[in-house]
């Protein structure tokens, strides 16, 4: 069973519908015990990292996520669900995040043009990730849908699975062991978004049982 975390994120219903469309067996929950025992975890998100962190902390989920990821539970973070994984964010003033992935959430550069980036843009899949199970059926250069003003400036270059150009070549997908996170919205990204979600479901089902 995939636990889709409900902390009040506005895109939760769309993420749930998209996962159900690709056949995922899921539960919508804000219960740390359910999240801890889930076969896989999805953290959706829109809005600001500070608000998201406050909600996760209030629900007792902020302490659980590092545990389940360290235990090898397949995890997918979406948009702000990706950003809160980092060490800190500069959005509305510096503040700490979950510190699961080393790095800082920074504002897209003014040279990008209109901020936030809203609309379709391409995934440039890194060569060493081109055969990863999450990218099955997703070509290099696939168009996906973004809505964001901030990006993840990660320290570990080796976990960057795809980049997207918008004033800067920012990480649009990161993968480390059984952790994956995407800056774009797969639930709004048409066939390629659904394919990525289906790939995540298959990837999580293929994961070895946790000991």
From Swiss-Prot:
GO molecular function: glutaminase activity; imidazoleglycerol-phosphate synthase activity; lyase activity
HAMAP family named in the record: HisH
Reaction equation(s) it catalyzes: 5-[(5-phospho-1-deoxy-D-ribulos-1-ylimino)methylamino]-1-(5-phospho-beta-D-ribosyl)imidazole-4-carboxamide + L-glutamine = D-erythro-1-(imidazol-4-yl)glycerol 3-phosphate + 5-amino-1-(5-phospho-beta-D-ribosyl)imidazole-4-carboxamide + L-glutamate + H(+); L-glutamine + H2O = L-glutamate + NH4(+)
Active-site residues (renumbered): 79 (nucleophile), 185, 187
CDD domains: GATase1_IGP_Synthase (cd01748)
Domain spans labelled Glutamine amidotransferase type-1: 1-210
Lineage of source species: Bacteria, Bacillati, Chloroflexota, Chloroflexia, Chloroflexales
Functional description taken from the UniProt entry: IGPS catalyzes the conversion of PRFAR and glutamine to IGP, AICAR and glutamate. The HisH subunit catalyzes the hydrolysis of glutamine to glutamate and ammonia as part of the synthesis of IGP and AICAR. The resulting ammonia molecule is channeled to the active site of HisF.
Record EC number: 4.3.2.10, 3.5.1.2
A Pfam family assignment: GATase
SUPFAM superfamilies named in the record: Class I glutamine amidotransferase-like
Subunit details: Heterodimer of HisH and HisF.
Protein name, per record: Imidazole glycerol phosphate synthase subunit HisH
InterPro entries in the record: Class_I_gatase-like, GATASE, Imidazole-glycPsynth_HisH
Protein encoded by which gene: hisH
GO cellular component: cytoplasm
């Amino acid at each position: 069973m995939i636990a889709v975390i409900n902390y009040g994120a506005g895109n939760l219903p769309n993420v749930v519908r998209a996962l159900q469309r690709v056949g995922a067996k899921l539960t919508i929950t804000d219960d740390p015990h359910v999240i801890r025992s889930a076969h896989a975890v999805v953290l959706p998100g829109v809005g600001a990292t500070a608000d998201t962190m406050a909600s996760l902390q209030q629900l007792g989920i902020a302490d659980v996520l590092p545990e389940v990821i360290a235990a090898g539970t397949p995890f997918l973070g979406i948009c702000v669900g990706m950003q809160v994984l980092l060490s800190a964010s500069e959005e509305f003033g510096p503040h700490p995040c979950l510190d699961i992935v080393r790095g800082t959430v920074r504002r897209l550069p003014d040279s990008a043009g209109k901020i936030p980036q809203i609309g379709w843009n391409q995934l440039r899949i890194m060569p060493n990730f081109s055969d990863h199970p999450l990218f099955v059926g997703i070509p290099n250069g696939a168009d996906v849908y973004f809505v964001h003003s901030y990006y993840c400036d990660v320290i570990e270059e080796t976990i960057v699975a795809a980049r997207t150009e918008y004033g800067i070549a920012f990480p649009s997908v990161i993968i480390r062991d059984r952790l994956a996170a995407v800056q774009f919205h797969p639930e709004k990204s048409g066939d390629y978004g659904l394919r990525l979600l289906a790939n995540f479901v298959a990837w999580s089902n293929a994961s070895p049982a946790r000991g």
